[in-house]
Amino acid sequence: GGGAVFFYFNHSARSNSYATMHDMHHGKSGGASQGMMQGHMHDEMTMPGLQGKDTTDTEVADLKRIFQQHMEIERRVTNLPNGISTFTASNTPEVREAIVSHVSMMVTRLAEGKNPEVIIQSPTLDALFDVHEEIETEIEVTDTGVNVFQTSSNPEVVKLLQTHAAEVSDMSERGMAAVHERMSQ
């Protein structure tokens, strides 16, 4: 079996480059286009970068809520010799529901090897989808969120799981600022 801790965002090697998407959002793509943002700050309300190859409206809505209300999320990660243990929660019912929904959908996607290829998705997540059959996942829904345990017998997969967990923690702490910083590197 396989699964995913949480959905993680950054540039996918299978999608347009971040620079191209960033320029398009800010009207720097040339020609008659004014860009989707017409010179404004990143669109924190519609978040067009959350769309993927086959993402559902529910998946995108969950991600928007998680990003827009990231300050209401509590997250703890423990690196294990063979993987990770994470706790992600919120005392805000709508945020908790988005977290649980998102984790459940991503665990299913990873088990099926069905990479959503979200525009701002992490290369780490792409790599995890490539090795999804080497990941064991257990989830436990709590009153405020979800515990996730992911393990692998492959040390390289363990490193990917730990990297992904750290990236998700950064996003839960800093929101889209973490994504934009990572994508501009």
Residue ranges and their predicted role:
Residues 1-185:
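Intrinsically disordered, low-complexity terminal tails/loops enriched in metal-binding residues
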